[in-house]
């Protein structure tokens, strides 16, 4: 309901915008959004590896990284982890992970992260290994050090409010300058699967500020694209580099949204007669599945409508597999066999058409995006040199 209300507000504000400003490529705001989905993060990781490879080829630069091309990178749950991996700096102030490093990360650490260690009275996994590996990989790096703007969501169960970690919020809310490993664990701490995460930071006057956080999907329902667009809109309004962009002018936004796959277009369907016999537990499981599937579809529908209303449908690309079956639908099956299947899903997805009405494949669409991102980066660099 909250997502629907937010969209309607955005939609009518956009329709009210009468700007006829032509899109200037060098001033376009580029946005990458990555869904949550546990081990299914392997699917968008395959897409990211392909896109980064295309950028390296187009610019003839093997050191090109995604963070060099996107103004905002947002993610929730496993998407938040991917966001951190490609934006957190190493000792050379470059992303500590290339896109090609992400799938091997899942294969190495996934079986340990999703190794049953809980109890029937608590979360399925104790989260200790996940937190440990995040600390090892991300170190003491904080939000302000991210190489581009980030938008990572979580939900505070003590204040009952979403918490959005972004660089642009730090001036007003310095307590949000948390360590990246705390943020990554928090956004991945899905109820039932991992324990909530408690940590503290400090306010501008030095007072202790505490967080009690769970999975960002509770705040963004798995798909952070609307959140990422909101952060990008604020960035466009506040950064002089985007001076020609009018408020909420989606003609000058380029959005790539990556999903982690859904069940065969609502593969698990039910009749009213069946559901009438369910108890509370059965309903809880079904509602979670229905909510995740519906929210992914509706967010895509909302955003598509907005971009079409501004005659900018080519500025938005949603990459999603809607026909997952068997073990690939599970967010915590980190067996080697299932992870290999997820790699195949991602590689096959690249060859599929973007829509039933378009012959363009995802691979072709991503190549088109890579050229746009490359040209825009060059134009901006030339403008900055004057």
Curated annotation (Swiss-Prot):
Functional summary from the UniProt entry: Probable lipolytic acyl hydrolase (LAH), an activity which is thought to be involved in the response of tubers to pathogens.
Glycosylation sites per record: 115
Gene Ontology cellular-component terms listed: vacuole
Other known facts: Patatin have a dual role as a somatic storage protein and as an enzyme involved in host resistance.
Domain notes from UniProt: The nitrogen atoms of the two glycine residues in the GGXR motif define the oxyanion hole, and stabilize the oxyanion that forms during the nucleophilic attack by the catalytic serine during substrate cleavage.
GO biological process, one term: lipid catabolic process
Protein name: Patatin-06
Catalytic residue list: 77, 215
Gene3D superfamilies the record matches: Cytosolic phospholipase A2 catalytic domain
Lineage of the organism: Eukaryota, Viridiplantae, Streptophyta, Embryophyta, Tracheophyta
Residues forming coiled coils: 321-384
One Pfam short name: Patatin
MF term (GO), any: monoacylglycerol lipase activity
Top-tier EC class: hydrolase
Signal peptide: 1-23
Keyword check for Transport: no
